[in-house]
Amino acid sequence: MSASLLVRTACGGRAVAQRLRTVLWPITQTSVVAGLAWYLTHDVFNHPQAFFAPISAVVCMSATNVLRARRAQQMIVGVALGIVLGAGVHALLGSGPIAMGVVVFIALSVAVLCARGLVAQGLMFINQAAVSAVLVLVFASNGSVVFERLFDALVGGGLAIVFSILLFPPDPVVMLCSARADVLAAVRDILAELVNTVSDPTSAPPDWPMAAADRLHQQLNGLIEVRANAAMVARRAPRRWGVRSTVRDLDQQAVYLALLVSSVLHLARTIAGPGGDKLPTPVHAVLTDLAAGTGLADADPTAANEHAAAARATASTLQSAACGSNEVVRADIVQACVTDLQRVIERPGPSGMSA
């Protein structure tokens, strides 16, 4: 019993250490930026309440190197817009409760209408505009505080941009490959669950298709965010200009990954849906090859191609043996999954050449 507890503790400790190791460098950068922001605003420029500079730096940098520059730009623009709107409402209505409600309504409405492109992604811009407008009314008796907030936001956000774009920009190729791997892992898991369902239909929980679909869509949404951020980093960070063509190739190839997700979800619906027909024996084999090929798509493309070829042969058998409409549809979906998997395996590698 004690030995088992020690093993579990050791495994948990290794997992914690691995999790911390992956974010230790971004956290270190955030800590340095927060300290610099406080030093510049409090010690150099003598702002008595310079707390917003390190706060804005931490909000922009966070514990990950993804989306830092985007958050910094959204925060700076949002703070500036909120201060302008807050000053206008204060000049007309003062700083009473009615003015507070009006300024929040106007700030949120204008921010939603003004949000375009990079600024529109996420809620940072909208929230910062509303918060800044509120603070203008709260500190209306001390106008210098308002402009110090804008200056502190510029310092904190500016330092975040310097660190995330000029000094330590994330590697967009690594970002894209990591997000792609997460999507492939989710696809592999749902295919493996389909294999188990076909082998023993009673072993799978009734709600597993919904949970699997939620995870797939969550990972796909993450890939969409990473694609936008990777393109921005490759375009604006001088240290990453050399990988622009590779980022473009990986970004364009992501469409095949989205098609694979769609095909696999459709396949899961036909296999795990209620009232399905008895499945032919080759279905188990083709699902096994699809799951194995998806799991090896990045680690071993040659082996993944072998599994894809085996799945294609089995899919052809399913198509030729299909007689009812359900079997024909299922065989066509399996063939689409194989085709999409093949395209995903043939992605461009980090050098820009075909993997």
Curated annotation (Swiss-Prot):
Q: Which InterPro entries match?
A: Memb_transporter_dom
Disulfide bond annotation, renumbered to this chain:
none
Q: Where are the transmembrane segments?
A: 22-42, 44-64, 71-91, 92-112, 119-139, 150-170
Keywords per UniProt: Cell membrane, Membrane, Transmembrane, Transmembrane helix, Transport
Cell compartments where the protein resides: Cell membrane
Cellular component (GO) terms are: plasma membrane
Question: How does the record say this protein sits in the membrane?
Answer: Multi-pass membrane protein
For the null mutant, the annotation states: Deletion of the gene confers resistance to arylamide compounds.
Q: What else is known?
A: Overexpression is toxic in both wild-type and mutant backgrounds.
**Functional description taken from the UniProt entry:** May be involved in the import of arylamide compounds.
The protein's name: Putative arylamide transporter
Taxonomic source organism: Mycobacterium tuberculosis (strain ATCC 25618 / H37Rv)
